[in-house]
């Protein structure tokens, strides 16, 4: 683990352990939760099994104490989650193989919300990334987050995905913004740590070949999908911590992502 990541984790432990302070305002950092909660209405890919929580126990035991426990199930790729590179690139990293250092780092937030609002099939372009670099500096080595503000539509599947239908036929009816494959290749050349977005996929809804996934994952760059609250982050200055459930051999996993900002 690098010294920078260790220092960030020390700040988190210190912030969360101070009595009388909330996690969102503790210490010298302000924390922003970038994950949707998992629930029965969480949005999953139309062909994927949704989230299910089965109650095992919820009540008083014969011994006189209260006890609650549940079983949960669902596809890897739904809700706020991480895509491991192996999801679209044979032989690349599965979830447990991704170094922690790659999931913690400076966030570069690309705001395309105004364009995405009126164009459901909008795709982030290379020109926009180049313009962002001219304004804010090199993007190399950061975690790139694409803000469309589609997270504000969650959990309304009709507005978020373009359809409430399920099954194979529903995939052709998906409409939401994503990242153009040329932009993905441009990011891969700059060795970014990971790429995230506040929509259901880093590829736009009408993608048939998932070229954006393939371009990034072939270079072992993970994806973060269905993020939330990116509107609360500045273009630069936030540190992202994106830690998935550590599933051995997983092509993806549920994700709790947070951003740390100076107060």
Task: Indicate where each model-derived feature is located.
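Bacterial N-terminal signal peptides that target proteins for export
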Residues: 1-6
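Residue-level signal for mature regions of secreted extracellular proteins and peptides
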Residues: 9-10
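C-terminal motif of bacterial Sec signal peptides marking the signal peptidase cleavage site
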Residues: 13-15
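Active-/binding-site microenvironments in catalytic and ligand-binding cores
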Residues: 17-263
């Amino acid at each position: 683990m690098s010294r920078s990541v260790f220092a960030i984790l020390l700040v988190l432990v210190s912030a969360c352990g101070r009595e009388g302070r909330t996690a969102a305002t503790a210490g010298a950092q302000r924390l922003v939760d970038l994950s949707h909660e998992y629930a029965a209405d969480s949005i999953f890919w139309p062909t994927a099994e949704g989230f299910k929580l089965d109650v095992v126990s919820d009540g008083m035991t014969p011994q006189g104490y209260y006890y609650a426990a549940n079983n949960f199930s669902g596809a890897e790729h739904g809700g706020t989650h991480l895509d491991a590179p192996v999801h679209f690139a044979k032989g690349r990293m599965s979830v447990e193989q991704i170094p922690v250092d790659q999931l913690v780092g400076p966030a570069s937030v690309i705001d395309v919300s105004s364009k995405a609002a009126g164009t459901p099939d909008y795709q982030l372009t290379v020109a926009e990334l180049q313009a962002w670099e001219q304004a804010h500096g090199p993007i190399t080595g950061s975690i790139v987050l694409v803000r469309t503000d589609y997270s504000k539509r969650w959990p309304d599947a009709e507005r978020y995905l373009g359809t409430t239908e399920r099954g194979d036929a529903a995939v052709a009816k998906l409409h939401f913004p994503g990242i153009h494959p040329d932009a993905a290749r441009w990011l891969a050349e700059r060795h970014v740590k990971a790429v995230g977005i506040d929509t259901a996929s880093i590829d736009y809804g009408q993608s048939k070949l998932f070229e954006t996934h393939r371009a990034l994952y072939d270079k072992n760059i993970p994806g973060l999908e269905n993020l939330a609250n990116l509107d609360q982050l500045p273009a630069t200055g936030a540190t992202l911590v994106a830690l998935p459930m550590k599933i051995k051999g997983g092509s993806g996993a549920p994700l709790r992502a947070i951003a740390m900002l100076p107060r």
